[in-house]
Amino acid sequence: MITTILWDVDRTLLDFDAAERAAVQSLYIEFGLGECSEEALARYSAINRKYWEKMERGEITKQAVLEGRFQEFFSLHGLDPALAVPFNAAYQRNLGDTVCFYPYALETVQALRSHVLQFAAT
């Protein structure tokens, strides 16, 4: 009998990609950059993925990921790359505050609540 469930939250219960898009879109408005198109969001995701893969291979540091992804993205879109540092700081805050559940994820956790212990694991 199962008594405990350990959830790996990102990309199982929570839709990280949707949260990422929402965080970038809201910051575009907050920074007075207008609206961020779906095409631009797809480009950002590709750039972001490229930087994280470089870090995983040991080619760059985490700090280089956090700043470089937005510097490259802004340069590509004709925006001031100097915005990368404050934009990243605000992005980290917004991403942490943005919760996007996958369909039925919240209902599943709630349904299991009275039957098993549940923990988030990373």
What is each residue range found by the language model?
Residues P86-N88, G96-C100, A105-T122:
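Substrate-recognition element of Asp-dependent hydrolases with the DxDx(T/V) motif
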Residues I2-Y102:
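N-terminal helical cap/lid subdomain that shapes the substrate entry/recognition surface
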Residues M1-I2, H115:
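A short, charged/proline- and glycine-enriched loop
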